[in-house]
């Protein structure tokens, strides 16, 4: 619990002034510009859906997973025990870099994760909420890319 509070304080202090929850179309545009549309065969709609269900489009979100003790960082709630510098650091990135609203490090790390054998299934929330959804198109409604 103390670690969580420290991480929350650090993320608050490192979050740029004016950073806030991003709009759906802003997220879609940043992910599109970052090359995620059909990356490894997953449509942009899948990525936007994942971002919503993981963080509600909050690039500075930090949530502790009480089941495994890991902490998720940023838009896609990338876990510290595997992917950033609090654990194995398979993305070669600091966990706090995943909180940047420009999403550059988040997108690059997500690309490494999805290249793994689980694909987007590495995010259980995607499997539950997005994978078999027949309304994925709604995530891009009204967005200009």
Curated annotation (Swiss-Prot):
Its main location: secreted. Pfam families: Lys. Residues 1-19 form the signal peptide. The keyword Cytoplasm does not apply. InterPro entries: Glyco_hydro_22, Glyco_hydro_22_CS, Glyco_hydro_22_lys, Lysozyme-like_dom_sf. SUPFAM superfamilies: Lysozyme-like. Belongs to the glycosyl hydrolase 22 family. This is Lysozyme-like protein 4. It comes from Rattus norvegicus (Rat).
């Amino acid at each position: 619990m103390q670690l969580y509070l420290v991480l929350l304080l650090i993320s608050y202090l490192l979050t740029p002034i004016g950073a806030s929850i991003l709009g759906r179309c802003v997220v879609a545009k940043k992910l599109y510009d970052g090359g995620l549309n059909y990356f490894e065969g997953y449509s942009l709609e899948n990525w936007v859906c994942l971002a919503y269900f993981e963080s509600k489009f909050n690039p500075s979100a930090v949530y502790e997973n009480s089941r495994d003790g890991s902490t998720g960082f940023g838009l896609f709630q990338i876990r510290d025990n595997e992917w950033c510098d609090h654990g194995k650091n398979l993305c070669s990135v600091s966990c706090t870099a995943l909180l940047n609203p420009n999403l550059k490090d988040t997108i690059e790390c997500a690309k490494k994760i999805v290249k793994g054998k689980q694909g987007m299934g590495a995010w259980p929330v995607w499997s539950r909420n997005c994978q078999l959804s027949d309304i994925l198109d709604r995530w891009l409604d009204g967005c200009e890319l």
